[in-house]
Amino acid sequence: MGMRRGRRLAVDVGDARIGVASCDPDGILATPVETVPGRDVPAAHRRLKQLVEEYEPIEVVLGLPRSLKGGEGPAAVKVRAFAQELARVIAPVPVRLMDERMTTVTASQGLRASGVKSKKGRSVIDQAAAVIILQQALESERVSGKAPGEGVEVVI
């Protein structure tokens, strides 16, 4: 089936901050969009809905945190719940979950290497993690010809 045309948004859900990234319609380059405050979840969903209306993505990909062994802990449960509600809020735009085992680690190492100071750097790190999630999603689709990760069912 090859690569579907169209923009995507990727979301890195953290406790305090939510990093957002997007890509061009050809799915070649993933770029940071913004960091959404994460503590007020309904407000975060509203802001993400506005971004979906603005960017008109064909799908939104969320990073699903797993342990290195592939198990799911409390963080994954939280992301699944967030994804479920987001899917309802932005329907009919599909939401997908992508394994993000290493992304935040990779993002913070990359930024540390480039000299980003931590407090201000945190929101940059969230966006960088979202960029990496999106790059992995695009790469996975390029290689497999299938939509990345797993779909989130909309429960009405």
Swiss-Prot record:
The Gene Ontology biological process annotation of the record reads:
rRNA 5'-end processing
Against InterPro entries, the record matches this protein to: RNaseH-like_sf, YqgF, YqgF/RNaseH-like_dom, YqgF/RNaseH-like_dom_sf
Q: Which GO MF terms does the UniProt record name? A: nuclease activity
List UniProt keywords, sorted A-Z.
Cytoplasm, Hydrolase, Nuclease, Ribosome biogenesis
* Keyword Ribonucleoprotein on entry: no
What EC number(s) has UniProt assigned to this enzyme? 3.1.-.-
Localization in the cell: Cytoplasm
Any Gene Ontology CC annotation: cytosol
Broad class of the protein's primary localization = cytoplasm
Looking up CDD domains in the UniProt record yields:
YqgF
Q: Which HAMAP family match?
A: Nuclease_YqgF
**Function of the molecule:** Could be a nuclease involved in processing of the 5'-end of pre-16S rRNA.
Q: Which family does it belong to?
A: Belongs to the YqgF nuclease family.
Name of protein: Putative pre-16S rRNA nuclease
